[in-house]
Amino acid sequence: MEHNGSASNADKIHQNRLSSVTEDEDQDAALTIVTVLDKVASIVDSVQASQKRIEERHREMENAIKSVQIDLLKLSQSHSNTGHIINKLFEKTRKVSAHIKDVKARVEKQQIHVKKVEVKQEEIMKKNKFRVVIFQEKFRCPTSLSVVKDRNLTENQEEDDDDIFDPPVDLSSDEEYYVEESRSARLRKSGKEHIDNIKKAFSKENMQKTRQNLDKKVNRIRTRIVTPERRERLRQSGERLRQSGERLRQSGERFKKSISNAAPSKEAFKMRSLRKGKDRTVAEGEECAREMGVDIIARSESLGPISELYSDELSEPEHEAARPVYPPHEGREIPTPEPLKVTFKSQVKVEDDESLLLDLKHSS
């Protein structure tokens, strides 16, 4: 029993030792894991910081690239502007060079002219032919003088001619000296001559002559186009047309007057409306009508149809159209128009006025 108890105790002690060893190992492992995790965290932090730095540098590089691009665009614009300005300068230099060439040509021409003048001056100085001409008050002082001479003369002839070209005694003689008029005087004279010619052309006499000539030409043209006989015929036909127009106008006025006279008046329509309510006077009116109706019917038979009233004013086709036309009946006689029956009826007193109503009725 004791042996078993000691063995159990030993086992317990061994187990306690093993548990202590495992606990120590677990603690060491946890410490190592913690240290490793700390290192890993520090490494991750360093990596993140480096990434942030790289991103910042990348942004800075992008900004720098953008600024470089903007500078390049500005440079290109400035380059294009400078190119345009240079082209303008080239054009201006070309124009200036052309102008300079023109100026050089003008200067050369002036130099040639100056040389000619100098040569002439030297010749004049050599000859020493200066003359002073004095005019009286009556004569106008000339603007310029010119001497008539031959340039092909030799020196000996010129020496002989010195006596000939002496100033003349008679100032009125123009044998060797003549006065050249200035340009302004010539222009004045030519202007005056033009004005005088215009005044002469537009004078009253010339205008009258031109009018007479034009009238003659127009009359000749008229006689060529239309002969006087034809003109007379045209005038006569115009007068006939006027007369026919006046006749037509008069006939139209007569026709209008006849229509206005034949139309019934407003009073007749009013009296017909009043007649319907007054039947008492019908009997008395019929008695009077019977006495007078016979004579009126007889007269109406003697009268022709109504279309013959205006036979004078209507033309032949209109007269034929105005005739009454009746439809043909087979096997029957053509009916003749019956005469108008006229009846007079006494009118009722309206506003103290008495009048007779004339009713025209076609017998049916």
UniProtKB/Swiss-Prot annotation:
It is found in: Cytoplasm, Myofibril, Sarcomere; Cytoplasm; Cytoplasm, Cytosol; Cell membrane, Sarcolemma. One of its GO terms (biological process) is muscle organ development. The modification Phosphoserine is found at S172, S173, S355. Residues 231-256 have a biased composition (Basic and acidic residues). The modification Phosphothreonine is found at T336. It comes from the Eukaryota. Residues 1-24, 231-283, 311-339 are annotated as: Disordered. GO terms for cellular component: caveola; cytoplasm; cytosol; plasma membrane; sarcolemma; sarcoplasm; Z disc. The modification Phosphotyrosine is found at Y326. Keywords: Activator, Cell membrane, Coiled coil, Cytoplasm, Developmental protein, Differentiation, Membrane, Myogenesis, Phosphoprotein, Transcription, Transcription regulation. Residues 44-77, 202-226 form a coiled coil. Belongs to the CAVIN family. Modulates the morphology of formed caveolae in cardiomyocytes, but is not required for caveolar formation. Facilitates the recruitment of MAPK1/3 to caveolae within cardiomyocytes and regulates alpha-1 adrenergic receptor-induced hypertrophic responses in cardiomyocytes through MAPK1/3 activation. Contributes to proper membrane localization and stabilization of caveolin-3 (CAV3) in cardiomyocytes. Induces RHOA activation and activates NPPA transcription and myofibrillar organization through the Rho/ROCK signaling pathway. Component of the CAVIN complex composed of CAVIN1, CAVIN2, CAVIN3 and CAVIN4. Interacts with CAVIN1, ADRA1A and ADRA1B. Interacts with CAVIN2; this augments the transactivation of NPPA. Interacts with CAV3. Interacts with MAPK1 and MAPK3. The coiled coil domain (residues 44-77) is essential for membrane-targeting in cardiomyocytes. This is Caveolae-associated protein 4. The lineage of its organism: Eukaryota, Metazoa, Chordata, Craniata, Vertebrata.
